[in-house]
Swiss-Prot record:
UniProt KW keywords: Cleavage on pair of basic residues, Neuropeptide, Secreted, Signal
Species annotation: Homo sapiens (Human)
Coiled coil segments of this chain: none
Source lineage: Eukaryota, Metazoa, Chordata, Craniata, Vertebrata
Gene: NPB
Protein's name in the database: Neuropeptide B
Secretion signal, residue range per the UniProt entry: 1-24
């Protein structure tokens, strides 16, 4: 009985060690000059948006801007879609806040977010 429990524990440990790690949903930018902005911090680590993300206004077409049917000006080069973005500064504009009519006391505020696509800007602190 003890031998089978030890064998099962060893097999489980071996499976856990050999399994590839799961992908992190949030990868912080390198350096200390990046700022966390709460729940949106993980979304700022790349230019692509999730198709399931909540948007304030729905798209008029079946595909989002930059998709296969978009005009050439809106299409991004594949390299640009996978770039990491370094958040340099976040300047909230509290005078441009308005209450949303959702009945939960939610406010939508505007902010200036300064981004950089250069790795050197992210490393300099």
């Amino acid at each position: 009985m003890a031998r089978s429990a030890t064998l099962a524990a060893a097999a489980l440990a071996l499976c856990l060690l050999l399994a590839p790690p799961g992908l992190a949903w949030y990868k912080p930018a390198a350096g200390h000059s990046s700022y966390s902005v709460g729940r949106a911090a993980g979304l700022l680590s790349g230019l692509r948006r999730s198709p399931y993300a909540r948007r304030s206004q729905p798209y008029r077409g079946a595909e989002p801007p930059g998709g296969a049917g978009a005009s050439p000006e809106l299409q991004l080069h594949p390299r640009l879609r996978s770039l990491a973005v370094c958040v340099q500064d976040v300047a909230p504009n509290l005078q441009r806040c308005e209450r949303l009519p959702d009945g939960r006391g939610t406010y939508q505020c505007k902010a200036n977010v300064f981004l950089s696509l250069r790795a050197a800007d992210c490393l300099a602190a």
